Regions:
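N-terminal cationic and glycine-rich segments that engage phosphates or anionic surfaces
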Residues: 1-102, 106-431
Length: 431
């Protein structure tokens, strides 16, 4: 693998893409420590040291690489974009116009991307307002009496909202730059960077905690086992054989070859985990407005925001399973695949072309997605439950969702680098 990295850096074009990607990640991390105007940075550091564990905005802070608790320019991280993407993809099912745009190809996709950007900015305004309110009323730093935002004037508030919203827009642009000019999916790599940046501090915290080295070693063993399981399942696939009939075009014979359709156990990747985690944060964010003593807000904090609450865990599992089926359905269309196969003379042995092929593919996808969704839910829950049992807390970046995202994004990025190496006749990473 190291030799493959050396070959990658010896290729000028690939080296330029890798360095560009790393450079954007560095810029992203620098922005995570730039304080927002109006925030007292020394007071923020005091509150971080003194505040109690807070699971209300734990996931947002994790996906922002700790920028949320720093109240930095990039406080919101990538979460507004993730939420906007969820809404736009849901609207594709409800609004025929959106589905028609998706089928129009590049122009339609560009239009949907534009809608996602607009919605991201709107959500960023809402979420930045929520963050400012929670910081002022003490919810962001429970147990800390120091004012992190000394000036509560309307001008300062508007300046902070504009700054955080602009930071979200800049993050979105940086992610798109990586996708266009770098290596891998830009948004996924920024999430990867945010989560990975929290690992060293979390490991140090666990090792120095009440459990000591023993708890640290047990947690590391669990993480290694979960990573091995994730890599094994993510690389597994069912191959549906496809044969192409011979056909004459002029004097030449085409077709007659055999290939296969690779069907992964987890076709949706880490998207269901991200979507489920994001949706569960919405009630907690809305609860940040208004009177914090209201009964329903206390109920939300105890049952939905707390990651170790039974209701939170149950909804988390159900949402992961739902989004597994939902995302698989919108990314793999059996009817479209069957039509393309029929158009080019392809068929599955023992299955008639056309509608029977589409029904067979749908049958296979439905049954493969079932264990895939259960696998995702288990991987997302096992580390969290283990951490609760060991008493090390749940607000650490080693949860199942974090491991799934880091490993999933890492595998996809390595595969993309490998494919570019193979195009240049080099040996790839995966042998």
């Amino acid at each position: 693998m190291l030799s493959a990295f050396v070959r990658a850096f010896r290729t000028p074009d690939l080296r330029r893409k890798l360095l560009f990607t790393v450079g954007i990640m560095v810029v992203f991390r620098i922005g995570s420590f730039l304080p927002t105007p109006g925030v007292s940075y020394p007071n923020v550091q005091v509150c971080i040291d003194q505040s109690e564990s807070n699971s209300l905005l734990g996931l947002v802070n994790l996906f922002s690489g700790g920028a949320l608790l720093q109240l930095s320019v990039f406080s919101l991280g990538i979460m507004p974009y993730i939420t906007a993407s969820i809404i736009i993809q849901l609207l594709r099912v409800v609004i025929p116009r959106f589905e028609a745009l998706h089928k129009e190809g590049q122009s339609g996709t560009a239009k949907l991307t534009q809608y996602t950007r607009y919605l991201t900015i709107g959500l960023a305004v809402l979420q930045s307002t929520t963050v400012i309110i929670t910081a002022r009323n003490g919810q962001l730093f429970p147990g800390c009496s120091v004012d992190v935002i000394p000036d509560d004037s309307i001008v300062t508030t508007l300046l902070m909202i504009v700054t955080m919203t602009a930071g979200t827009g800049l993050i979105m642009w940086l992610g798109e730059l990586i996708t266009e000019r770098g290596v891998g999916n830009g948004m996924s790599l920024l999430i990867f960077t945010s989560i990975a940046a929290s690992f060293p501090g979390a490991m140090w915290s666990i090792a120095g905690g009440s459990g000591g080295i023993g708890a640290f070693l047990v947690i590391m063993a669990i993480i290694v086992l979960v990573i091995a399981l994730v890599v094994f399942v993510e690389q597994s696939q069912r191959r549906i054989p496809v044969q192409y009939a011979k056909r004459m075009v002029g004097r030449r014979t085409y077709g007659g070859s055999s290939t296969y359709i690779p069907i992964k156990i987890n076709m949706a990747g880490v998207i269901p985990v991200i979507f489920a985690s994001s949706l569960l944060q919405v009630p907690a964010l809305l609860a940040g407005f208004g009177d914090q003593t209201a009964g329903w807000k206390q109920w939300v904090a105890n049952n939905l925001a707390a990651t170790d609450a039974p209701l939170h865990i149950a909804l988390y599992v159900l949402l992961i399973i739902f989004f597994c089926y939902f995302y698989t359905a919108i990314t793999f269309n059996p009817d479209e695949v069957a039509d393309n196969m029929k158009r080019y003379g392809g068929f599955i042995p023992g299955i008639r072309a056309g509608r029977p092929t589409a029904e067979y593919l749908d049958y296979v996808i439905t049954r493969i997605t079932a264990p895939g969704s259960i696998y995702l839910a288990l991987v997302a829950l096992i580390p969290t439950i283990a951490f609760i049992v060991l008493g090390v807390g749940t607000n650490i970046p080693f949860g199942g969702s974090s491991i799934l995202i880091v490993v999933g994004v890492g595998l996809e990025t390595v595969k993309q680098i490998q494919s570019q190496l193979e195009q240049r006749h080099y040996e790839g990473f995966l042998r």
